[in-house]
């Protein structure tokens, strides 16, 4: 009897509750006509009854419903796989609820045959910013491999529920996206927000093997562009977009080159996601209070175009090699034309009296104004006329061992005599043995060759690892390419930027060959006319020239390694050998007229290593304190080098230096106002003024790119020294040969054009990856090279011509006596 009563009560309650649910739905959404089925659990107690409202929904219809702790709503979309949907169509679901809370959100679960998708409203991104309206595109099952949906009835179930005690209203809709596919060479516009990501499908047309996809926007709101395989699920939220495919952050523009061979179905998804903040794109972030997020809607345009064919790769490669091969042809022609105009034949034309003149006579004349010397020193230092026997107890100057001049007490006195004369000539600073000096300068290129091997191998290993990480993770923010002109080949993502450094290598090798040819001619000259050659022209030592050629080759290798994956972590690979080139050029200019007192190789390379170390510290830890310390060190080093150059190495730093300076100031106060070596003093005064200005500017302005700032200092000093050397050469009555003048003018043109392309700023590693991409530009040469690649070509030519200037600048002095060639 009791059981019968309970069954009757259950039926009554079921009918009553169903009528209440229908009345509520008709009240909330009276304008929508849909089929409703209500189900109640028959086993629970009355207070725990749970109601499920099933709605047979239609696409394009908006539903306004309520949910609470005791109810849920299931929207069912039934369709035919052939008639209703196809590969060009996708379904997009939108849910909004302004009354939902973080503690009791509206939960949305979408069930499809291939998987499920779920989210909550409000949607909290980064656990801070709340979005009360969410739109998601469902993964199209028709795009999946091995899909058997043709001629089959399909259904999509959307469950909406909430754990809120009070009724929570929400709005729900699902619509078809008929233009889901991106078309080739057609612009497509889209609107994206953090809670409303978008993605579209692109399918490679026939005969198209690679495409470049460009995304542009006028807004700088930060977003992510992701390329993913055709598979479910599609990762279209900020928290999971990094889990699949490749991606870039974007502010105003992004670009990706994609190859059909990397995708099974020759198709992919382009996923657009707006980030809740701009830190990843702009490097700064405006602080916002937690809670409702501000509007971050971004309008973007998407364009897909075909990339260059493989034939264009061959054109770009062979054009570059052919261009630099022209320099080899020109060099060969010039060498053939000047084959009969070498120095050895010209020396034969010098009269016997001019060749046999006693150099001690000119030495005494040139030093008479400074003070007298004993006759023994004059005899000791006078060379022997060819064919004449060497007097007993006397040694020829060219047979003096270097240790005799460097360590003996008498030799130190000779240094003080010769190097402190008011009028110095090259003969005064070319007294060491030619054989010993040649060995000393050979150390430069052998040491640099060793440094290049030990420095280059780890660099190559590191950048290859970067390239592998880029491919494995898909994070294209790792490398700062010009994505609008990045042509991959093999394992390299940007082959053109790597290959464009071929000019440094080819021209560096050519310069080494030219130096070797000149060195061979000089060795032949020494063998045939050694006594004559020793007294004429600038002393020829080619070790620094070989080192310059090796440095140019290594600049190409290191720059190529850097451009495998250019970023903040490996910038020094591209600049380290530029510092070395600048230092070697300055050392070579100084060595030309100071062959006996140039810096030793290990000292020079140690200083260059300290410069590179300082560049790294300046980029990583460029604080205000660092800039102050750097400015002080810069000015102090400038003074030390000035003293070393001014006194020709005849001074030393010890604990008595300040005492000596005080005595000089007290005893020769008036003479201090009139420098003894005016030319040197003027050069050093101008050089110190410029370097101090650089140091003060750095301490005050604190440039963001310390590496470029430091390189500018070295280049500025090198240009200043070259200009001074040429001016002093002309003021001394010396001439410059026409071929050297032509190369000087040509190098000015090439340097000007090279700097024009250098300042195009296509990328910048001291910005964020998205900020760097704002400067990306299309290719400008052969549809293969961008402006920075042209900079590589032009700067390689400019450096090569600059090296030739140093090699040929003093050729007019080959027939001039060394005791008549002034030192400056």
Q: Which residue ranges define each predicted feature?
A:
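Long, hydrophobic alpha-helical transmembrane bundles and adjoining juxtamembrane helices/loops
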Residues: 3, 25, 38-65, 74-77, ...
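Noncatalytic modules at the cell exterior or secretory-pathway interfaces
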Residues: 86-92, 141-167, 207-212, 258-279
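Generic N-terminal leader segments that precede the first folded domain
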Residues: 68, 73-84
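Cleavable N-terminal signal peptides of Sec/SRP-targeted secreted and luminal proteins
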Residues: 3-21
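Short, surface-exposed loop/turn motifs at beta-strand boundaries within globular domains
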Residues: 70, 84-88, 101, 151, ...
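Surface-exposed beta-strand/loop patches in noncatalytic accessory domains
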Residues: 25-72, 96-147, 163-193, 216-259, ...
